[in-house]
Amino acid sequence: MNRIKVNIPEGVSGDFSIRKQHMNNFCGTEEPQGFYTILYHNETHIMQDTTREYREHKQFLNDAHGNVLVTGLGLGLVNESLMNNPNVESVTIVEKYQEVIDLVWNHCPKNDKVRLICAAIYDWKPD
């Protein structure tokens, strides 16, 4: 797998937005030309569903085991890989911004292994 493509519609919630954009040669990479989903905070690009983003997460996804803590929901790219990993017992995602949750969570794959908490990671205390 070279890319985890998300199925999140365009939208705005507070200072966050999801946009579909056509890209060619993204950030000077050999990214295939096509439409990509991008999460923005104000006008700052936070995350996209590109092969580059997947490569940045690949080692973590391959090595994950036990009870996994994910700091930030982003586009929810890691959810499906983690929940389908037989070495992962549970996935706890801590997302600081309710606006990101409102835009993304309903469109993410999830099962009984995955739970989402709205909190700043440094303020959150595990059960």
Name the predicted role of every residue range.
Residues M1-N67:
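Class I S-adenosylmethionine
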Residues N2-N7, R52-P126:
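The AdoMet/dcAdoMet-binding core of the Class I SAM-like
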